[in-house]
């Protein structure tokens, strides 16, 4: 059982009870569609297009930092979070959908994890943090990040850039170098049955014994994480074939042992995508705990859709 099991069980128990304090805790009950507003903002000479989802009462607000691939804004997840009192800004990645600029591909491996591209994407996410922070200016709403997969390298860069970021959440975010992650992906070949035939020891040996042959400079997220003191939560799947979970947890434990306020949740049977019905309550509960959401939530009103 992972270290957040007790808080999550408490959260689920709270969600099941319809009490007078329900308005200050996450709820799984269906609610009206949250208000949302489309926005455009600028980053390094291009225009990005996104949507801000605004709950009637807001506990916190997050920028959703997407993973690799030609990803569009995550409106479905944004609605779920808004119904739990968490506002969000989600946007089309540069060069995708309605956003300008050039998408750096391919879908996996090589040049989408170059330091140049990661810095570019972190600049975009930093601009999104500024937009979201300005939207809630004067309301004392904590701003955070939720990074997905590749976002595990991007979000720490954003947090070192912007003092407005107060917490971080990582959905299958690597705490390993880009070289290690690419070597791991080639080793697993993204096959779901990989862990039926290989062990953690074999993975470690493969990562140690196979020198890199990649035409880009390595990026180590630990270098950024060592500079940060804000709270962080990482969610991992034990059967992930895109991110080496065991090594990521080892690095994360070392950071926590040095005094960093970092936590993790491990789902042994989950893959890289995790399970939304489990992961989302864990994220919401942790954010509530981290921002000290007690008493009345911030009543920010609604903007026209």
Name these PLM-found stretches.
Residues 25-55:
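N-terminal cap/lid segment of alpha/beta-hydrolase-fold proteins
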Residues 59-67:
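Short beta-strand element of the alpha/beta-hydrolase
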Residues 77, 230, 244-254:
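Short alpha-helix in the alpha/beta-hydrolase fold that links the catalytic acid
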Residues 82-105:
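Conserved alpha/beta-hydrolase
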Residues 111-135:
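Alpha/beta-hydrolase active-site loop
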Residues 161-205:
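Hydrolase active-site cap/lid region
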Residues 228, 234-236:
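Short beta-strand/loop motif that positions the catalytic acidic residue
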Residues 270-305:
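Catalytic active-site module of serine/aspartate enzymes centered on a nucleophile-bearing elbow/loop
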């Amino acid at each position: 059982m992972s270290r957040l099991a007790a808080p999550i069980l408490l959260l689920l128990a709270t969600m099941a009870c319809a009490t007078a304090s329900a308005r200050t805790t996450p709820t799984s009950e269906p609610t009206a569609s949250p208000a949302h507003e489309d926005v455009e903002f600028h980053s390094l000479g291009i225009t990005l297009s996104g949507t801000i989802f605004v709950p009637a009462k807001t506990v916190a607000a997050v920028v959703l930092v997407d993973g690799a691939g030609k990803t569009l804004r995550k409106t479905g997840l944004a609605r779920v979070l808004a119904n739990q009192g968490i506002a969000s800004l989600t946007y089309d990645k540069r060069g995708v959908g309605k956003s300008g600029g050039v998408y750096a591909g391919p879908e996996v491996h090589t040049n989408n994890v170059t330091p140049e591209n990661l810095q570019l994407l972190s600049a975009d996410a930093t601009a999104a943090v500024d937009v979201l922070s300005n939207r809630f200016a004067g309301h004392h709403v904590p701003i955070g990040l939720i990074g997905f997969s590749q976002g595990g390298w991007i979000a720490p860069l954003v947090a070192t850039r912007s003092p407005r970021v107060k917490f971080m959440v990582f959905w299958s975010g690597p705490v390993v170098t880009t070289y290690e992650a690419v070597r791991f992906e080639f080793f697993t070949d993204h096959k779901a049955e990989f862990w039926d035939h290989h062990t953690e020891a074999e993975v470690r040996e493969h990562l140690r014994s196979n020198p890199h042959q990649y035409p880009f400079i390595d990026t180590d997220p630990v270098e950024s994480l060592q500079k940060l003191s804000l709270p962080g939560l990482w969610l991992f799947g034990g059967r992930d074939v895109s991110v080496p979970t065991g090594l990521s947890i080892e690095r994360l434990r070392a950071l926590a042992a040095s005094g960093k306020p970092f936590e993790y949740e491990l789902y042994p049977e989950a893959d890289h995508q995790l399970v939304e019905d489990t992961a989302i309550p864990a994220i919401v509960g942790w954010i509530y705990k981290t921002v000290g959401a007690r008493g009345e939530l911030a009543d920010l009103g609604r903007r026209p859709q």
